[in-house]
């Protein structure tokens, strides 16, 4: 197994630049990415008749999903899976659904295209909505039904069998860095709560989808809040989220609900 971090194109400048609202850089980058992906397959195939073609899995974030969508449509050789997280939107006029991408299909005939968008990601929607401010209807969110991808959660939760906790994604970043409670958290993910951070639900699921094991994704028990005392001896689940493994007793209580 090998991991290639592909940075072979000009990505948009950060705000206040409006480049992220355009698809021009994504189209140009998509052409280059398609050539790279096809090159991996063809190079491996030319080495020996006894060597099987590589199993390629594409993982893309933010504007990279826009770029990857153009690449995947242009491919000559299908990849095994594609995973989009925190997407800046897909150009629906050119890519009508996940089925338009050259990605392998599961036994039921559905493309192995996985999508996730965290509810606390406030940046990705800006790219999608903002792309429509340039005089025409803009890009659409691949997490919505029109795209036909396989959606999975980034909200965190507890494994229903073991009680193990998986943290939520709390922002747009692949790797969280912001201090909890600071002004940075309006848009940035807090430390340990980025899409690819260890022990997050999103990071765990992306590890599965990008190694051909997306069928093993579980639906988790939603994260609980600590209970705070209220009037009349009552308590209410309004405290911080409990991001630790559940005790056997707590897990049994959740399983019985």
Which sequence ranges carry the predicted segments?
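Short, hydrophobic alpha-helix immediately C-terminal to the catalytic nucleophile
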Residues: 69-73
């Amino acid at each position: 197994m090998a991991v290639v971090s592909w940075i072979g194109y000009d990505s948009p400048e950060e705000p206040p630049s409006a480049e992220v609202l355009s698809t021009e850089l994504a189209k140009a980058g998509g052409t280059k990415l398609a050539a790279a992906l096809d090159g991996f397959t063809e190079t491996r195939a030319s080495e020996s008749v006894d060597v099987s073609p590589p199993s390629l899995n594409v993982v893309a974030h933010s504007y990279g999903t826009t770029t990857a969508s153009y690449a995947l449509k242009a491919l000559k050789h299908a990849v095994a899976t594609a995973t989009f997280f925190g997407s800046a939107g897909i150009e629906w006029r050119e890519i009508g659904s996940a089925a338009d991408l050259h990605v392998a299909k599961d036994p039921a005939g559905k493309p192995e295209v996985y999508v996730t968008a965290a509810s606390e990601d406030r940046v990705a929607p800006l790219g999608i909505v903002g792309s429509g401010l340039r005089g025409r209807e803009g890009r659409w969110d691949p997490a919505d039904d029109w795209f036909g991808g396989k959606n999975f959660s980034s909200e965190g939760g507890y494994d229903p069998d073991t009680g193990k906790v998986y943290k939520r994604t709390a922002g747009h970043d692949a790797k969280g860095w912001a201090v909890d409670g600071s002004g940075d958290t309006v848009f940035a993910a807090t430390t340990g709560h980025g899409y690819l951070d260890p022990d997050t639900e999103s990071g765990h699921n992306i590890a599965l989808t990008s190694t051909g094991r997306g069928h093993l994704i579980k639906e988790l028990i939603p994260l609980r809040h600590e209970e705070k005392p209220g009037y009349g001896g009552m308590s209410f689940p309004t405290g911080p989220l409990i991001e630790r493994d559940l005790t056997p007793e707590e897990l049994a209580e959740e399983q019985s609900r």
